[in-house]
Amino acid sequence: MCIRDSKWGFNYSITGYFAKKVVYYQNAITQSSQVVYEYPFPIIRLGDLYLMYAESLNEATEGDNNVPEEVYTYLRKVRERSGLKKGVLGETEDIGDVRVAWEKYSNDPTKPKTKDGMRSIIKQERKIELALEGHQYNDLRRWKDASKELSKSIKGWNVQGEIEEDFYKVTTLFVPRAFTTKDLSLIHISEPTRRS
């Protein structure tokens, strides 16, 4: 199932998962050759800016039940760009609107109406939209969730499996390391000294 041959060495994924998102569409690897094209990958994307703006608006607003309409607007832009819009799955509701999606398809339909709920939703949207783009580590540190999230076991498929049934068994690959909040806290920036 995984690509492990003498020519390319260990050219395989330890988890069994392969990322297609950041791979140029003309790249190809076969048993006998490898074609790799370099391309300019965007460092900052518009979706990232929209999500940062929505998060900032949510955090800057006073009160817990006072989520600004603009937060929903910018989340909608990100969701619609990725294909979540009215009619895409045959539904009549606009699932690009996070309020509609959570009301219809979740166990907590009131979650988007509170500041804490929107914080959680924005975190989830960032994980989905910006997956494999190098944002998650610093997001986890900024949210102070790193010690909880990075201390979990890493799981994947059994890449040693020779048949499908063995390959697709979820396996614990790494036992979690113990991270502390101190290890993962942001670097302190002191106040600049004033010149008299």
Segments (PLM) and residue ranges:
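Acidic/polar-rich alpha-helix caps and helix-coil junctions
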Residues: 4-186, 190, 194
